């Protein structure tokens, strides 16, 4: 039995470094890998290799992101670090790099700066709930009172965006000194990682969440009934489970799954990530369509009005060449389908330029199964002009 090999020994968590430019995010990432590598838990990545992040394309948007992985005694981590500010914005909004928690890097020499604020706001909007603060470059500040002051400022800023500013752990250190092999600084990095282990909870596995499957295709099997197929987004489904067909219509259809198939073979249980066909009892072909979802009863509702945090593609990324204004009517691509919606810009925002990120309100012309944290693209005549995430449900 060669099954042992696949056992996950440690829980897996995705984290990333966020914070203002030149405050030391990449240096810290390098320092973490170096300090853990000395304990045999990682491969050291140097600053240059992390900084030369490869380009990736996520939903048509070009993003530079460095991925490093390492382990602590307790966990396995995938850590993302993006070189430029624009890369962070795109990363967080598209969910190209899903973060369970973040390390906010603030230089003690500067204190919170504009991008510190922006990254905290983005974390709040896209649903990163846990932040640990690393106060960097503390070796360059002689005065402890000054450090206390900077720490207070950071805590106040976090509280302003509804994070528990008073309770968030703040670790003081110097990433550069740790990279240079200073023992005290290395101990600070270990303290940081112990804190991340303790403070950022292990995320719920996708299979433990309530069942949800966006419907991609519908067909009829003569004598057996209607099959809805798609990729299971979360949770599990098996024969005998009750599910609801939700979206695009005001009425929710309740049904029971009478068969689950994958690659034309029957399956005991489909789980998150599987592409399956679900045979639905007593459902007419006309009652289910692409763009709806199959879901555990009561777990998701339809909405027409929401706020979204959106990155607007530049001309070079294939986006619009011109700005848009309130009452702009593009399509919003949720799950597997486009629905037209009307945009209302926030007060004080006259127009949105390609390359901007913005929070706006959308009113859809049909109800869609949406929830906070759901990703979508904004499209115009079939081409992507923006990428977003639902930050609030408004109806």
UniProtKB/Swiss-Prot annotation:
CDD domains documented for this protein: EF_Tu, EFTU_II, EFTU_III
Region feature (G1): 19-26
Annotated compartments: Cytoplasm
Keyword Magnesium: yes
G4: annotated segments: 136-139
Enzyme class: hydrolase
Entry function: GTP hydrolase that promotes the GTP-dependent binding of aminoacyl-tRNA to the A-site of ribosomes during protein biosynthesis.
Catalytic activity: GTP + H2O = GDP + phosphate + H(+)
Sorted UniProt keywords: Cytoplasm, Elongation factor, GTP-binding, Hydrolase, Magnesium, Metal-binding, Nucleotide-binding, Protein biosynthesis
E.C. code: 3.6.5.3
GO cellular component, one term: cytosol
Keyword Secreted (UniProt): no
Domain tr-type G: 10-204
Residues engaged in binding Mg(2+): 26
Positions with a binding annotation for GTP: 19-26, 81-85, 136-139
Similarity comment text for this entry: Belongs to the TRAFAC class translation factor GTPase superfamily. Classic translation factor GTPase family. EF-Tu/EF-1A subfamily.
Quaternary context: Monomer.
MF terms in GO: GTP binding; GTPase activity; translation elongation factor activity
Region (G2): 60-64
Protein name: Elongation factor Tu
Spans annotated as G3: 81-84
Segments for region (G5): 174-176
């Amino acid at each position: 039995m060669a099954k042992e090999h696949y056992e996950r020994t440690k829980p897996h968590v995705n984290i990333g470094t966020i914070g203002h430019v030149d405050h030391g995010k990449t240096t810290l990432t390098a320092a973490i890998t170096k300090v853990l590598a000395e304990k045999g838990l990682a491969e050291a990545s140097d600053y240059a290799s992390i900084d030369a992040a490869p380009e990736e394309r996520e939903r048509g948007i070009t993003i530079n992101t460095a991925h490093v992985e390492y382990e602590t005694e307790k966990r396995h981590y995938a850590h993302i670090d993006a070189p430029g500010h624009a890369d962070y914005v795109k990363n967080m909004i598209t969910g190209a790099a899903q973060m369970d928690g973040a390390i906010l890097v603030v230089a003690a020499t500067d204190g919170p700066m504009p991008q510190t604020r922006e990254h905290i706001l983005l974390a709040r909007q896209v649903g990163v709930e846990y932040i640990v603060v690393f106060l960097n470059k503390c070796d360059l500040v002689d005065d402890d009172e000054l450090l206390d002051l900077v720490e207070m400022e950071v805590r106040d800023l976090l509280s302003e965006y509804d994070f528990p500013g008073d309770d968030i752990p703040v670790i003081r250190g110097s990433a550069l000194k740790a990279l240079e092999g200073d023992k005290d600084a290395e101990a600070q990095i270990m303290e940081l990682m112990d804190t991340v282990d303790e403070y950022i909870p292990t995320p719920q596995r996708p299979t433990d969440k309530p069942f949800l499957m966006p419907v991609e295709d519908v067909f009829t099997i003569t004598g057996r009934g209607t099959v809805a197929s798609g990729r299971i987004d979360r949770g599990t489904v098996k024969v005998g489970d009750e599910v609801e067909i939700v979206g695009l219509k005001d009425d929710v259809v309740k049904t029971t799954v009478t068969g689950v198939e994958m690659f034309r073979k029957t399956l005991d249980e489909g789980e998150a990530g599987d592409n399956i066909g679900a045979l639905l009892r007593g459902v007419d072909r006309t009652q289910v369509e692409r763009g709806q979802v199959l879901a555990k009863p009561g777990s998701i509702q339809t909405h027409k009005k929401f706020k979204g945090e959106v990155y607007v593609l530049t001309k070079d990324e294939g986006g619009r060449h011109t700005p848009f204004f309130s009452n702009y009517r593009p399509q919003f691509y949720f799950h597997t389908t486009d629905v037209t919606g009307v945009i209302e810009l926030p007060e004080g925002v006259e127009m949105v330029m390609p390359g901007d990120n913005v929070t706006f309100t959308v009113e859809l012309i049909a109800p869609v199964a949406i929830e906070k944290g759901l990703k979508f693209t904004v499209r115009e005549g079939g081409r992507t002009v923006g990428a977003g995430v639902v930050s609030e449900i408004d109806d």
